[in-house]
Amino acid sequence: MLISTKGRYALRMVIALAKLEKEKKAPVSLKDIAEAECVSMKYLEQLARCLSSKGIITSSRGKYGGYRLSDQPKNILAGDVLRAAEGSTAPVSCLEGDTPCPRQDVCTTESIRRGLDAVIEKYIDSVTLADLLKE
């Protein structure tokens, strides 16, 4: 699995959000996250939509609005953040989606690909946001 810039920035965004939310004890603006992570507001807006649509963060409007984590850091998985941003964590494109590869029955590398996919999924789903905050 190659984690794209979008996936890395999504992880950075939720880590920064967790830190800033803990400090402020209030919703956090994208401006504050952008400044903390040196990422453009426009890019964070795209990520916020992805993360919000998957229920990882929530937003509120108004003078005291902003973003919050939808759950405690110990309950938010790195895998969920990456899947929200990336769409898929499959190591090869033929493992993505519901349609099986037409060469599945004769493919000599399928077991390696499936094994690799299982290891990646297991690992990223074992790392929580709380774990990342400790680093």
What is each of the regions a protein language model found here?
Residues S70-E135:
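Non-DNA-binding regulatory cores of transcription-related proteins
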Residues M1-V14:
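Short alpha-helical segments that sit at the start of domains
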Residues V28-C38:
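A short alpha-helical element within helix-turn-helix/winged-helix DNA-binding domains
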Residues A48-R49:
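Short, hydrophobic-biased segments on the C-terminal half of alpha helices
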Residues G55-L69:
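Beta-hairpin "wing" of winged helix-turn-helix
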